[in-house]
Amino acid sequence: MALTKAEMAEHLFETLGINKRVAKEMVEAFFEEIRQALENGEQVKLSGFGNFDLRDKNQRPGRNPKTGEDIPISARRVVTFRPGQKLKSRVEEANAGK
């Protein structure tokens, strides 16, 4: 099961007792801030959680799986996420007994 933005807003509503519309706007604003920073080429560091980074990938050879034809995969910039040590530890602890 995946956690959705709607579920995050619902959690804010239940936990903080704020209006549902305001909770949804807060979640949207949080992610919009991250999007804008990445669009501007900035790294996003969330203490205790992890970092969103931009990485440039060079052009490389690829292959069309249907035809087997060689085709170049163009150079591009991708977003990567590196979890922080606290997040890694909590996930490991949560899954240790499973």
Curated annotation (Swiss-Prot):
One of its GO terms (biological process) is DNA recombination. Residues 49-72 are annotated as: Disordered. It comes from the Bacteria. GO terms for molecular function: DNA binding; structural constituent of chromatin. PROSITE patterns: HISTONE_LIKE (PS00045). InterPro entries: Hist_DNA-bd, Histone-like_DNA-bd_CS, IHF-like_DNA-bd_dom_sf, IHF_alpha. Keywords: DNA recombination, DNA-binding, Transcription, Transcription regulation, Translation regulation. One of its GO terms (cellular component) is cytosol. Belongs to the bacterial histone-like protein family. This is Integration host factor subunit alpha. It comes from Shewanella loihica (strain ATCC BAA-1088 / PV-4). The gene is ihfA.
